[in-house]
Amino acid sequence: MTRKDDESDQFFCSFCGKNQKEVKKLIAGPSVYICNECVSLCEEIIEDEDKESLAPAEASDKKLTPREIKDVLDTYVIEQDRAKKVLSVAVYNHYKRLDAEVKSEDDVEIQKSNILLIGPTGCGKTLLAQTLARFLDVPFALADATTLTEAGYVGEDVENIILSLVQNADYDIEKAQRGIIYIDEVDKISQRGDNPSITRDVSGEGVQQALLKIIEGTTASIPPKGGRKHPQQDFVKVETSNILFVCGGTFTGLEKVIERRISQKSMGFGAEVQSRKEKNVGELLEQLKPEDLIKFGLIPEFLGRLPVVTSLSELNEASLVKILTEPKNALLKQYQRLFEFENVKLTFTEEALAAMAKEAVTRRSGARGLRAIMEETMLDIMYELPSTENVRECIVGEEVVLKHEPPILLFEQAKKQA
């Protein structure tokens, strides 16, 4: 009901309760009034909701070029330019193919190009796939190939990968069928000739065979509530032919396979002799051929479903320092934001950043290991800081990283005295 003060003959806003003297305008309706302030507030709320609802559609409808896709990857992933170019072109062609199939019904069928990423731990393989999925606003699922087994053995069925994607799409099947799946550690399911357990291959070549169909494109039957299949259960049908599969692995020792092939071809008089130490692993991986991956242990049928192959280089100390500071969600920026909640400025010296990068190289953990090193460095600081009053800046130096010594704290009192 509209409030009206009979004695003063004043009208009140039906929403906020302010009278006509407290606002600029009071608009009358059928037995109700609304003030100009509430109208402005309603406009802001509607505008914000429209932006949120339209943003995903605009992102998915916009025709992004490979260059624009790479520009987005550049803001989150340091270096690895060739891998980012390969991914950008592959993703661009993949979704262009899906759009073309909707608009055209001619006889030309363009097959999808799944991707194989080869590189050491912590070089950015998983992050590249995650960033693509987030930016393109498509569902994303991450799977570990080492947990997969053939049907009939204890372990994860390969179709559970599709189930994870459907769950991440909130069971929107149409949306899930345009998603991205990243399968990590595919090098661990390789079948090598010298494998002592070749007679019982539970999670090696058998898993490669099981992955063939869903990667190439098939109709997978997914239990709606997860878990193992039951005969009485109603299955959800998911078409995988439009799902982009990105596989990744470290492939430790692959460079030796490549080197052996190159050495055999370069034997004889006049051949250039180069020691193994002089040969860079990254340079060897650039000379990768499908036959090398087959000798490593991937079966030809599985490799044939991954036509786009690219390698990522190992990150050196300079690259790791950039990863700490430059990306949009850089680790240092995350901790600085945490310290801002305490009204404290967090500063790392160049020596401290270099020490963290050097430790990550020593551990051979790449960018993934930087968070663990940062946590170790910051544990005592973050434990003591909330109990310490009037701190305005925390300066972390090299000794804090290497010897876990206390950081330099600057207090508000020192600022006032100065």
Curated annotation (Swiss-Prot):
<feature type="binding site">
    <location>
        <position position="38"/>
    </location>
    <ligand>
        <name>Zn(2+)</name>
    </ligand>
</feature>
<dbReference type="InterPro" id="IPR019489">
    <property type="entry name" value="Clp_ATPase_C"/>
</dbReference>
<keyword id="KW-0479">Metal-binding</keyword>
<dbReference type="InterPro" id="IPR003959">
    <property type="entry name" value="ATPase_AAA_core"/>
</dbReference>
<feature type="binding site">
    <location>
        <position position="35"/>
    </location>
    <ligand>
        <name>Zn(2+)</name>
    </ligand>
</feature>
<dbReference type="Pfam" id="PF07724">
    <property type="entry name" value="AAA_2"/>
</dbReference>
<dbReference type="GO" id="GO:0140662">
    <property type="term" value="F:ATP-dependent protein folding chaperone"/>
</dbReference>
<protein>
    <recommendedName>
        <fullName>ATP-dependent Clp protease ATP-binding subunit ClpX</fullName>
    </recommendedName>
</protein>
<dbReference type="InterPro" id="IPR027417">
    <property type="entry name" value="P-loop_NTPase"/>
</dbReference>
<dbReference type="GO" id="GO:0008270">
    <property type="term" value="F:zinc ion binding"/>
</dbReference>
<comment type="similarity">
    <text>Belongs to the ClpX chaperone family.</text>
</comment>
<dbReference type="GO" id="GO:0051603">
    <property type="term" value="P:proteolysis involved in protein catabolic process"/>
</dbReference>
<dbReference type="GO" id="GO:0009376">
    <property type="term" value="C:HslUV protease complex"/>
</dbReference>
<dbReference type="GO" id="GO:0051082">
    <property type="term" value="F:unfolded protein binding"/>
</dbReference>
<dbReference type="InterPro" id="IPR004487">
    <property type="entry name" value="Clp_protease_ATP-bd_su_ClpX"/>
</dbReference>
<dbReference type="InterPro" id="IPR046425">
    <property type="entry name" value="ClpX_bact"/>
</dbReference>
<dbReference type="GO" id="GO:0005524">
    <property type="term" value="F:ATP binding"/>
</dbReference>
<dbReference type="InterPro" id="IPR038366">
    <property type="entry name" value="Znf_CppX_C4_sf"/>
</dbReference>
<keyword id="KW-0862">Zinc</keyword>
<dbReference type="InterPro" id="IPR050052">
    <property type="entry name" value="ATP-dep_Clp_protease_ClpX"/>
</dbReference>
<dbReference type="GO" id="GO:0046983">
    <property type="term" value="F:protein dimerization activity"/>
</dbReference>
<dbReference type="Pfam" id="PF06689">
    <property type="entry name" value="zf-C4_ClpX"/>
</dbReference>
<dbReference type="GO" id="GO:0016887">
    <property type="term" value="F:ATP hydrolysis activity"/>
</dbReference>
<comment type="subunit">
    <text>Component of the ClpX-ClpP complex. Forms a hexameric ring that, in the presence of ATP, binds to fourteen ClpP subunits assembled into a disk-like structure with a central cavity, resembling the structure of eukaryotic proteasomes.</text>
</comment>
<keyword id="KW-0067">ATP-binding</keyword>
<keyword id="KW-0547">Nucleotide-binding</keyword>
<dbReference type="InterPro" id="IPR003593">
    <property type="entry name" value="AAA+_ATPase"/>
</dbReference>
<feature type="domain" description="ClpX-type ZB">
    <location>
        <begin position="1"/>
        <end position="54"/>
    </location>
</feature>
<feature type="binding site">
    <location>
        <position position="16"/>
    </location>
    <ligand>
        <name>Zn(2+)</name>
    </ligand>
</feature>
<feature type="binding site">
    <location>
        <begin position="120"/>
        <end position="127"/>
    </location>
    <ligand>
        <name>ATP</name>
    </ligand>
</feature>
<dbReference type="InterPro" id="IPR010603">
    <property type="entry name" value="Znf_CppX_C4"/>
</dbReference>
<keyword id="KW-0143">Chaperone</keyword>
<feature type="binding site">
    <location>
        <position position="13"/>
    </location>
    <ligand>
        <name>Zn(2+)</name>
    </ligand>
</feature>
<dbReference type="GO" id="GO:0051301">
    <property type="term" value="P:cell division"/>
</dbReference>
<comment type="function">
    <text>ATP-dependent specificity component of the Clp protease. It directs the protease to specific substrates. Can perform chaperone functions in the absence of ClpP.</text>
</comment>
<dbReference type="Pfam" id="PF10431">
    <property type="entry name" value="ClpB_D2-small"/>
</dbReference>
